[in-house]
Amino acid sequence: MIDDDTLLADGFEKALIGFGYRHNQQIAIYDYHRCVEVLVERDGMSEDDAIEYMDYNVVGSYVGEYTPIFFNRDLMNGYSA
């Protein structure tokens, strides 16, 4: 069940991969690359423009303590636990 306070990113429903918790608050988690695909398909952006838009307008935005997380699997390259 989605908490009433959980913020969802409008227009990125196809990129929602789940929910997590930050300080006992439910946070929506989106796949960064799927968000880029949505912008390319839905808005007709080039991939470079979609990445720039994501980085500046979406990932770079703070909309309060329930701000969604955008998981970028590329940041995991070279990391091993």
Language model regions located:
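C-terminal alpha-helical interaction appendages
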Residues: M1-A81
